[in-house]
Amino acid sequence: MMKKLISLFLLSCFLFSCGQAQKTDKQIIQETMQAIEVPKQYKQEPAYYVGIYSANIKWELFVNDVQMFAHYQGKITSPIVPLNYRILGSGKQKITFRIYPPNEQAVLGKYASFRMRLYYRKNFRDKEIPEIHILNFELPYEQTKDLPYFEKSFEFEAEVPYQMTGWTKSKDLTKVPDLEQKVVKKIEALRTILENKDTEAYFQAVMPKLKEKFICLYATQQEIENYFQEYSLTSGEFSKIFDDIQILPIEDYQIILEPNNRLVKLRQKNGDSFTDGIKFKAIVKEDKKETTGNYLFRFHIPEGSDELEVIR
């Protein structure tokens, strides 16, 4: 009798474990695709950009009072930054640059250099259509060389075929008394997901931001599917580039509110620089050298909720 009970117990355990078999990446992506509404495709899909050249400074770029890009190393850089990610709909837009001295320097100095050009393309997929100039700016040397900080804002009109909610219906986070605890708790939960390489939970956590991201980038069904394949925690691009990915603990952090007070992120000190979000270290497969990186998360609290949600 006892042997029969043991056999039945072992059989039930086996059947349960089979029933709980881990989903494959293909299954996860198929199920995730079903939860995504593929954005409408338009005849004209305008895209806005800012091209920047800088040297011997640190700087931050904000679009509509939400950080879009940052350069904290002080070295020469020349990125082309797409802006649609912060453009919620047609109408007046604002871009702001905050410029700081390089490490251990009190003022911007005589070697500070910053140039930018703002432009757009009527249809970003058609590279034959020339870019359309909006404005240029160059850091005025004589007026700024002795300044410890410089900020400049510009407004421009954008026309896009979509309209998104974004952070327009988010709570004012300055009125949330336990904001730091909420952010740290959310970051720790995301750290656990990353450590466990739980792709399904990761996609679920970032789904609110992805839905709007795909809209403003005019993503096709194939592009969306490619995105999920690329960002799988088990078989995506990171796993092809890195070995021994280790999610690092949260240390020496501060809570950063975006200027609109609707978005928040966690920033960690990283030597003379900063890292936003969750840090990791890994071994580069190609040269076997150790490197570091990060997963950036911003949060908001939608109206009618008390819970933080990942946002663009």
Question: What are the residue ranges of the model-derived segments?
Answer:
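Beta-strand-rich interaction surfaces with strong enrichment in secreted/lumenal proteins
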Residues: 68-70, 82-87, 103
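Short strand-turn-strand beta-turns centered on an Asx-Gly dipeptide
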Residues: 58-74
